[in-house]
Design a protein with these regions (language model features):
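Phosphate-binding/switch region of NTP-binding enzymes
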Residues: 1, 6, 127-179
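Conserved lysine of the Walker
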Residues: 9-10
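Phosphate-binding/switch loop-helix module in NTP-utilizing enzymes
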Residues: 80-142
């Protein structure tokens, strides 16, 4: 899922993950773009169909409080989404974790925020991302897991920092928010 900042990549990928989880798939989520607790609040708001702003501010109607309580109970019952704290984790760490997990669907939000501890100092950022993208593709093929990945576009509307991202992906969905 590729788009410019603010175009809704994280929201769309979250909706895909929630749908997969509701269908009984185990989802493992690596939120590199936002803190773990913020991603959890977004999942809760979406599940409760409550505005994010209301949930963040704590100013909720009785109906919204009931919807949140129901969503918490539902999420506990159907705990098919696992958020993984990836603070300081490299691409190698994340890929090893995916390999060990029993999940069906993986969410990486977003690719350009991944770092590769095996990269040499002389490697360009484009080369590092091409390597990460290629390794992710091989991991998906080897494990049979679906890997949903968000990616930024540059100012020219191209996948930022590496053409390999589009070449390695099975499908690329370009997200464009119209004003």
């Amino acid at each position: 899922f590729a788009g410019e900042p603010g175009d809704g990549k994280s929201t769309i990928i979250q909706n895909c993950a929630e749908t997969a989880a509701m269908d009984g798939k185990k989802v493992r989520w690596y939120p590199l773009e936002m803190p773990h607790n913020e991603q959890m609040l977004r999942l809760l708001a979406s599940s409760a169909q409550v505005d994010n702003g209301s949930l963040y501010s704590g100013v909720l109607t009785n109906g919204e409080c009931q919807a949140i309580a129901s969503a918490v109970a539902r999420l506990k019952r159907n705990a098919n989404v696992e958020l993984v704290d990836v603070e300081d984790a490299s691409a190698t760490d994340i890929f090893a974790d995916i390999e060990r997990s029993d999940c069906d669907v993986v969410v990486v939000d977003y690719l350009q925020l991944m770092e590769d501890s095996s990269a040499r100092k002389s490697d360009t950022r484009e080369g590092v991302l091409a390597s990460i993208s290629r390794r992710q593709k091989r991991l998906a093929r080897r494990t049979g897991k679906v890997i949903l990945t968000a990616s930024q576009l540059n100012d020219s509307g191209k996948l930022r920092e590496s053409r390999a991202i589009g070449q390695d992906a099975d499908k690329v969905y370009l997200i464009k928010k119209y004003a």
